Amino acid sequence: MLVVYMCIWVLYLLLFLFLFLFIASPASLRRSQTHILQCLYYFSLLLISGCAFFHQVLCLVLPLFCFVLFCFFYFFRSALEVFASLFPLPFSTRSHETISKSRIIIKAARGII
């Protein structure tokens, strides 16, 4: 997550440098008779606004989504535990209980008990 965040900031920096050093000077836009420079200018503005939107999604929506997902799975697990306590399985899923029951069965089979 930190790597993605740092890559976004590097992309911001490169785009703003490109925008303000090469494209955004009004004199170069007025001198330019071709539409390529203007297209690059508007494309870089669109790219920066898209990166800003992605940054907002990454910083605001993603943590909120993770929190909602965590709450869902936490309560879903609690609901599963309540459901499992209402309808117990015929065998134990806990390893220490299973091991102790198997030891009792082995001892009973040997005739020790």
Swiss-Prot record:
Keywords: Membrane, Signal, Transmembrane, Transmembrane helix. Its main location: membrane. This is Putative uncharacterized protein YOR082C. The chain crosses the membrane at residues 34-54, 56-76. It is found in: Membrane. Residues 1-29 form the signal peptide. Partially overlaps WHI5. The keyword Zinc does not apply. GO terms for cellular component: membrane. The keyword Transmembrane helix applies. It is a multi-pass membrane protein.
